[in-house]
Amino acid sequence: MKTLSKLTTALLAAGALCGGVYAASNGLDARAETRPLFNDKRPIITPQSLPGGAYDPNGDFSNDPNPKIEHLFLPWEDVDLSTLSTADEYARKRGRSLLITVEPWSWARNWRVTPADLLSGILAGHYDSNMTAICSAAAKLNTPVTIRWAQEMDEKNGQFTWAYWKADDYVKAYKHAVTVCRKSLPTAKYMWSPMGKDGLEAYYPGDSFVDVVGLSVFGYQPFDLRKLGRDSTFVEATKPGYDRVKRFKKPIVIAELGYQGNEAYVHGWAEEANKPHSEFPNLQAVVYFNDREVYPWPDGLGRPDWRVATPPLLN
C-alpha cells in the first residue's frame, strides 16, 4: 500500500545510508561488476536520455543523480500532511521536483464510499476541505509541484472508485478538484493522467485544466505471453496511449512505468524506457513505479513486482 508514512520512513532511512554515487552513463553503481547486471532493474540513463523520476518508497533511487522527479501518492483522507515537508527537503537536496498523485478516497478499503456517493460529495463541495488541505500544504514547499488527480480513470478493472463514473461526471469532478486546488496552489502544474485506453478522450477536461498529460505503461512478461504469445517492447506498449493523447498537444509524461520478466525482457525495457524515440516527440519524462503492484493482474497472473531490486539497494 502506498502510504505516506512508508514514504517518510524510506526517505529518512535513505538519508542515513552512504555509498557509491551512480554513474550517469548507465545508472549503475561502482559495485555493478560484482553482481548480475539486471539484478538492478533501473532504467538505463545516458546523456541523451529523457529526464527520469521515481516513486521510490524503498529508497533505491536515493543516491542516484539521474532522477529529476520524486513521485508521491496521497489519499485525500487519513493522511499526515506534515510529512510533506520531509519529502520536499529530500527532493530539494537531490534537485528533483515533486509529482503528487492525489487519490480521492481513503486507503482503508472499508472506509471507502460508493462511486455515486463520492461523485455527489465532490460536486457538492463536501471534500473541498480535503483538497484544500493538501494543496495548502503543497503551497508551502520549496520544490516545483505537479498535481495529478484521480489517475487512470479510463481503466475499467475495478481498481479505482472514480473509474466507475461516466466520462462527463469524471470531467466535472476533475474540474472541481483542480479549481479548488488552484485557490491555494496557483503555481502548480496540473496533470491529467489516463491509463491510455481507447475512448480516453471522453475524459479530457479541457486545455485550461491540463498543463501536462500523464500515461501509465507497464510491461509484464507473463501477461505478454498470455495475450500476445510473445514479449512486448517499451515502444509497442507506449504507442497506443501516446497516439491517443497526442491530439491534446500537451507535454506528455509517463507518470508510472514498470516492467518485470526474465533478464532479456528487463534488459530491453530498461534500455529503451528513457531513450528518446522518434515515435514520441512530445514525451518529456519517464517516472518509474518502484514498488509491487497493489492489485492482482487478470487471469491469475498475480501481483507484478516492479521493484528495481529485491532486497532494496543499500545505496
Predicted regions: what they are:
Residues Y174, V178-L200, P251-N262, Y288:
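Aromatic-lined carbohydrate-recognition surfaces of secreted/lumenal glycan-active proteins
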Residues E33-S129, Y259-N262, V287-Y288:
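N-terminal substrate-binding region of glycoside hydrolase catalytic domains
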Residues L81, S85-K189, F289, W306-P311:
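Substrate-binding cleft of extracellular glycoside hydrolase catalytic domains
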Residues G19-P36:
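C-terminal region of N-terminal signal peptides and the immediate post-cleavage residues
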Residues P36-N39, P43, T146, Q151, ...:
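Substrate-binding cleft of secreted/luminal carbohydrate-active enzymes
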Residues G196-F209, V266-H267:
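Distinct, well-ordered alpha-helical segments
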Residues T86-E103, P205-S208, L215-N262:
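Glycoside hydrolase catalytic-domain groove-lining segments
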Residues N58-N66, S82-I100, A133-N142, Y204-S208, ...:
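Acidic (Asp/Glu)-rich catalytic clusters
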